């Protein structure tokens, strides 16, 4: 399964930290790439630096035209999941979604245009209450992969060695 996260409505002056966290969660929880509407070199550099140090093949692209990207993805056979508190409950649809080969997960920053609700194959709610898009993405990906993404070895230069106390980081010097 290939997962692309599309970050809609990124505003560089307001959303730098949250968009970075969306990217970090996407990478750590099993997505293959993030596409960011709008340009923000600092977010791109930050995420690429994490990939360089901690491993994986996660890619980051900013400045995308989201409507074109959604249409292109859908026309090529991919399925679109829009995370929104107004959608169907995650537990009702996650089984169907798991059967897809390519998924684009749409995560909004500001008010999401109605077109997104219409083009999405699934509008999915991780709870029907307001909360963070970072939390919604983490829960969605964890449910999608049934926790298996947490066992992945990213093959990076740095690797955390789980410890009951303190911080243990292995530097493999790659």
Curated annotation (Swiss-Prot):
Homodimer. S-adenosyl-L-methionine binds at residues 83, 108-112, 126-133. NCBIfam families: PRK03958.1. Pfam families: Trm56. The lineage of its organism: Archaea, Methanobacteriati, Methanobacteriota, Stenosarchaea group, Methanomicrobia. It comes from the Archaea. Belongs to the aTrm56 family. This is tRNA (cytidine(56)-2'-O)-methyltransferase. It is found in: Cytoplasm.
